[in-house]
């Protein structure tokens, strides 16, 4: 029988548990008083023998034995062993209570899913519910001594109404050496399937819900059976019991009061009654009694589960729910808050203190002064002042390595750029399109200014120029002649009219207009792609195709004509990348992989001329003719993904070029 005292400890008061200490049923006094009396009697008997019956020599020997037992009895880990054992027992006890079978969910499903107000429908619902209660009864009868005393045989089960005589015969005819608590579950499933076939259960989903819930109910019963079958290992129980009783057996001798005149350490007083030793026995032995009572909650102790009450309650409630309450509904009426959007139930005078406003959050009443609100430029000030003096930024800046543009290292590298990539989009305009302008036009981010200055400086990408370029071309139709064009770009941040090719060139030999060799530092050049004619020493191949939109392609021998380039930029300004344009397209020549490599200096190399103020007068090309080459560029872009040539550039150092003369990496398209 469970001892309930929840109402007495509902409120914390001064010495609130004092009333619980006076209870007898389910108390520690009722469990421990016998052992406590035995321990006190044994202690008193040994004390009387020591004081009255022993001689002087025998007393000296007993005193040495008492000191020895007191010293080494503390080495027994009673607290450690008891703590783990009682924790394990309490967890096991609570898990068994959580898994007690309750038929409330099943009776709800049966009452709402099995239809029919006639006698057959009523019989179906009551029979299904009776099978559910019979399953739990068979389990309780096998694990609980109190239930077994109530139903010692199956005849008592039939007499109690949980099983009919025909069901008893069928149950007994099943020859099985195992516990047959699962038989009512099979009957439940068969009867539910029959009700589905008869139309009493109108949907297969309802049948599945019934079977799922019944399977859950059966698993609760199986778990209780498993707890009864497999308990806490016997060794653990024996170790705990021996540790506790051995410790207090040693205390019977070791905690005796010795003669104070002998001067033993800790034996200055002779109180006759060992108060703290008795308290220690009360606590440790009572701790062990807690584990003994909770290790099997299906017994007949004061704090064991009320299994017989569970059987009665489940049967009464379940039959009431599926029979008398089936389709029994009260008349619907409007509630008292029908026209009130904010329902507010009344409070009594005793509960008036519990009427409190709704909780809206802990920060709802927190106020902030005007100085705590940041200004609009707080992020800029944080980046300007906080990051400038950042220690981590200084460490990273110190540990970072920067390669000088004039580094004498020779490096051979390759790179690949797919034809579907953005190779015709220059980096500067693309980056400008993604940049978000600051709110203040007179204030710019330091990082943004730094990126723009790096973007405009030809020396910035010197360390990036070690990668050679890979251009996708066609051996048959890529190298073709295009009509001349020119494009003028006034600002590096303005999107060009003609798509450009981003070429990352390694340190390669470059030739100036006066045939002098110069030191070509690595840079990123933004070229307007119109075609480049390689060295005259290479093999020339006639183009196999003509770009659409150019009916009269210009074909000129490479030995008699030169490729003219226009350099559109202020020669004295080093902030922006150099841009080259081809004023006219000559006969294209294809370079195979076998012919790659640095060529000797030839007087017939393409002459690269920087742009001047009058490019039209020199080349005869009007500046506004750049927009007429859009079909040619499209044709070239379509022919890029046919084949890939890998070009290799070797780092060779030549003499310095004069100031203002652009560097010319050798590139084949």
Swiss-Prot record:
Residue spans of biased composition, Low complexity class: 475-492
Bias kind Basic residues: ranges: 440-451
Sequence ranges on the Extracellular membrane side: 52-60, 256-274
Residue span of region Disordered: 399-496, 533-560, 591-627, 646-669
An annotated Gene Ontology molecular function: chloride channel activity
Keyword hit for Oxidoreductase: no
Top-level taxon: Eukaryota
Record field: compositional bias (Polar residues): 533-543
UniProt KW keywords: Calcium, Cell membrane, Chloride, Chloride channel, Ion channel, Ion transport, Membrane, Metal-binding, Transmembrane, Transmembrane helix, Transport
Entries under InterPro entries matching the protein: Bestrophin (IPR000615), Bestrophin-like (IPR021134)
Basic and acidic residues bias (residue ranges): 646-656
Any one GO biological process: inorganic anion transport
Transmembrane segment boundaries: 32-51, 61-82, 238-255, 275-288
Chain positions recorded as Ca(2+) binding sites: 10, 293, 296, 301, 304
Ranges in the topological domain labelled Cytoplasmic: 1-31, 83-237, 289-669
Keyword hit for Heme: no
Membership in a protein family: Belongs to the anion channel-forming bestrophin (TC 1.A.46) family. Calcium-sensitive chloride channel subfamily.
Record-given protein name: Bestrophin-3
Organism: Mus musculus
Gene name, Swiss-Prot/TrEMBL: Best3
């Amino acid at each position: 029988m469970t001892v309930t005292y929840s109402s007495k400890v509902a409120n914390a008061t001064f010495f609130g548990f004092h009333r619980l200490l006076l209870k007898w049923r389910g108390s520690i006094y009722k469990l421990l008083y016998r052992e406590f009396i035995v321990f006190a009697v044994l202690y008193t008997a040994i004390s009387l023998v020591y004081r009255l019956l022993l001689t002087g020599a025998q007393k000296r020997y007993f005193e040495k034995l008492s000191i020895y037992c007191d010293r080494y009895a503390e080495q027994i880990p009673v607290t450690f062993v008891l703590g783990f054992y009682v924790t394990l027992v309490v967890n096991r006890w609570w898990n068994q209570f959580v898994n007690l079978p309750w038929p409330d969910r099943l009776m709800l499903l049966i009452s709402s899913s099995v239809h029919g107000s006639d006698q057959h429908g009523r019989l179906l619902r009551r029979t299904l519910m009776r099978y559910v209660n019979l399953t739990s009864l068979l389990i309780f009868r096998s694990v609980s001594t109190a239930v077994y005393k109530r139903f010692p045989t199956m005849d008592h089960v039939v007499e109690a109404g949980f099983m009919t005589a025909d069901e008893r015969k069928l149950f007994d005819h099943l020859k099985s050496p195992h516990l047959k608590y699962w038989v009512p579950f099979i009957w439940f499933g068969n009867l539910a399937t029959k009700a589905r076939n008869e139309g009493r259960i109108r949907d297969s989903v309802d049948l599945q819900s019934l079977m799922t819930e019944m399977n859950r109910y059966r698993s609760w019963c199986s778990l209780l059976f498993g707890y009864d079958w497999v308990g806490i290992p016997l060794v653990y129980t024996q170790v705990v019991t021996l540790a506790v009783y051995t410790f207090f057996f040693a205390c019977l001798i070791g905690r005796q009061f010795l003669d104070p005149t002998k001067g033993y350490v800790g034996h200055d007083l002779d109180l006759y009654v060992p108060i703290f030793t008795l308290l220690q026995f009360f606590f440790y032995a009572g701790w062990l009694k807690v584990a003994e009572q909770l290790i099997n909650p299906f017994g007949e102790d004061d704090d064991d589960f009320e299994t017989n009450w569970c059987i009665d309650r489940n049967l009464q409630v379940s039959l009431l729910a599926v029979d008398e309450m089936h389709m029994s509904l009260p008349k619907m009426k409007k509630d008292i808050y029908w026209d009130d959007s904010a329902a507010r139930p009344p409070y009594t005078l005793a509960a008036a203190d519990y009427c409190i406003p709704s909780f809206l959050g802990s920060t709802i009443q927190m106020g902030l002064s005007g100085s705590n609100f940041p200004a609009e430029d707080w992020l800029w000030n944080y980046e300007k002042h906080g990051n400038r003096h950042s220690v981590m930024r200084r460490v990273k800046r110190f540990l970072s390595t920067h390669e000088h543009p004039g580094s004498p290292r020779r490096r051979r590298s390759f790179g690949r750029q797919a034809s579907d990539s953005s190779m015709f989009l220059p980096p500067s305009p693309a980056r400008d399109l993604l940049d978000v302008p600051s709110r203040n036009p007179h204030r710019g981010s330091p990082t943004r200014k730094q990126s723009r200055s790096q973007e405009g400086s030809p020396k910035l990408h010197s360390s990036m120029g070690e990668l050679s370029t890979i251009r996708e071309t066609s051996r048959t139709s890529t190298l073709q002649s295009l009509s001349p064009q020119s494009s003028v770009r006034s600002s590096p941040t303005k999107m060009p009219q003609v798509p450009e090719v981003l070429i990352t060139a390694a340190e390669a030999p470059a030739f100036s207009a006066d045939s002098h060799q110069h030191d070509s530092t690595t840079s990123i050049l933004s070229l307007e792609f119109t075609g480049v004619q390689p060295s005259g020493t290479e093999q020339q191949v006639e183009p196999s195709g003509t770009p659409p939109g150019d009916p009269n392609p210009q074909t000129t021998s490479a030995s008699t004509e030169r490729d003219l380039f226009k350099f559109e930029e202020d020669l004295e300004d080093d902030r922006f990348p150099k841009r080259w344009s081809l004023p006219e397209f000559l006969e294209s020549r294809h370079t195979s992989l076998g012919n790659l490599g640095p060529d000797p200096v030839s007087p017939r190399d393409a002459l690269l001329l920087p742009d001047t103020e009058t490019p039209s007068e020199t080349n005869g090309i009007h500046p506004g003719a750049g927009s007429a080459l859009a079909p040619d560029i499209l044709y070239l872009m379509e022919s890029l993904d046919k084949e890939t040539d890998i070009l290799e550039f070797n780092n060779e150092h030549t003499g310095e070029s004069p100031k203002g003369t652009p560097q010319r990496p050798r590139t084949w398209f």
